[in-house]
Design a protein with these regions (language model features):
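C-terminal structural segments of small proteins and small subunits
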Residues: 66-96
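Short S/T/G/P-rich N-terminal loop/turn motif that feeds into the first structured element of a domain
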Residues: 1-55, 64-71, 97-101
Length: 101
């Protein structure tokens, strides 16, 4: 099993806009679990907001194999979400992929 973790830094500075983006990102990303083959799970969680410098959102997903992760990364539905996020929603991201077990 492969774990794919992405932390997101959002572009908006307005707290209300940021919150709307967090909700929409969570909805769009978690919906991919039902349409992309090889996905075991996709979870998206907002930061607790205790420390201001923390990034506000993290994606934790699991895949059957590295091949399944590779297919996810190029899947048209995933690319559509990425394109939407890259259009002024996300300022930066950090990704870690690793084998579980």
């Amino acid at each position: 099993m492969i774990r794919h973790i992405v932390a997101f830094q959002l572009a908006a500075s307005d707290p209300d806009v940021r919150q709307r983006h967090v909700v929409e990102m969570r909805s769009r990303l978690e919906a991919l679990a039902d349409v992309v083959p090889g996905v075991i799970s996709i979870e998206v969680h907002p930061d607790l907001g205790v420390v201001d410098s923390h990034w506000p959102l993290i994606l934790v997903s699991s895949f059957e194999s590295t091949e399944a992760l590779d297919q996810y990364l190029v899947h048209p539905r995933h690319r559509a979400v990425v394109d939407w996020m890259n259009d002024g929603i996300v300022a930066n991201r950090v990704v870690v992929d690793y084998a579980v077990g």
